[in-house]
A protein has these predicted regions:
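The feature marks proteins involved in alpha-glucan
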Residues: 1-27
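Short, surface-exposed connector motifs at secondary-structure boundaries
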Residues: 180-187
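Hydrophobic faces of well-ordered beta-strands that scaffold small-molecule active sites
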Residues: 31-35, 64-66, 117-119, 186, ...
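Active-site-proximal helices and loops of the catalytic beta/alpha 8
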Residues: 174, 189-287
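Non-catalytic surface loops within mature trypsin-like serine protease
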Residues: 23, 37-39, 221, 255
Length: 293
């Protein structure tokens, strides 16, 4: 069995490349509309969301991004309903939203209106009581006492996955391929904390199921990258992420953007940074421009 060095996350024999993907520049002109199913309608269901699709399309929406649609963990849950980013089962839909058939019908309705559908992929971590934690405890990061661990202390409702385990790669990619048979792409949560080599392999394999699959990375603030690296954890920069993703977040400009809005920084500094992006990122890069996450 091929092994992954746990200390350095140096990938051996996994046939990963080191080149940037040729991104789809048409994404520059497309509008992504984010929906949290629980809060979008009074009912908080897939079926109820369907009734709003015509309005969403009329806004000029090209891509509908559904925040996590999966069952939420109970152990360590934040609040009564829990965070959708503490996922219990990657391969199921949250029964509070409806059935799998309801989800399939929703995606069909999205497509019928000329929009694409992408779903959230939360592959850095799961809930402590997840299916994977029960069936594959070897997939998880451990502390010195052998207990499931996490790198970000105040994310107390999750435990981190350990991508030095080759079998985890296979499970996760198989899951992506299952969803790629239904949806048009993925918004990948805290993508920087999952090895870029994993995302490269995932993209190649998903392409066999969904040619032209959309890949949006939630890249991270510079402060997060510094902290992860200080801890000895791998963390990809935006430039790294373009080896596998079509789009990254605009976090690299957000401190300046917020300062401009507050009148603390002249607009010219922000436009200078936009130019710097053109000089820094690979040809064909796309940034997801947004006012907040």
């Amino acid at each position: 069995e091929q092994q992954i060095d746990k200390k350095h996350i140096d990938i051996q024999g996994l046939d990963v490349g080191k080149v940037m993907v040729q991104g789809d520049k048409s994404l520059l002109h497309q509008v992504i509309y984010s929906v949290f199913v629980r809060c979008h309608t009074p009912e908080g269901t897939f079926h109820a969301l369907e009734r709003d699709l015509d309005r969403i399309r009329a806004l000029g929406t090209d891509i509908l991004w559904l925040m996590p649609i999966h069952p939420i963990g109970i152990e360590g849950r934040k609040g009564t309903l829990g965070s959708p980013y503490a996922i219990r089962d990657y391969r199921a839909v949250n029964p509070e939203y409806g059935t799998r058939e309801d989800f399939l019908h929703l995606v069909g309705a999205i497509h019928a209106r000329g929009m694409k559908c992408i779903i959230d992929v939360v592959y850095n971590h799961t809930s402590p009581d997840s299916v994977l934690a029960h069936d594959h405890p070897e997939f998880f990061l451990r502390d010195e006492q052998g207990r499931p661990a996490r790198k970000v202390a105040d994310w107390w409702d999750i435990v981190d996955l350990d991508y030095s385990v080759p079998a985890l790669w296979t499970y996760q990619i198989d899951t992506l391929k299952q969803w790629a048979a239904i949806v048009d792409g993925f918004r990948c949560d805290v993508a920087s904390s999952v090895p870029i080599e994993f995302w490269e392999r995932a993209r190649r394999e998903v392409e066999t199921v969904r040619p032209g699959c959309i890949w949006l990375a939630e890249s991270v603030h510079g402060a997060y990258i510094r902290e992860m690296r200080r801890m000895g954890a791998a963390c990809s920069t935006d430039t790294d992420l373009y080896r596998a993703f079509d789009m990254t977040y605009d976090y690299d400009l957000w401190p300046c953007y917020e300062a401009v809005l507050k009148g603390k920084t002249p607009l010219c500094q922000f436009t200078d940074l936009l130019t710097y992006q053109e000089l820094t990122y690979p040809t064909g890069y796309v940034k997801a421009r947004c006012v907040e996450n």
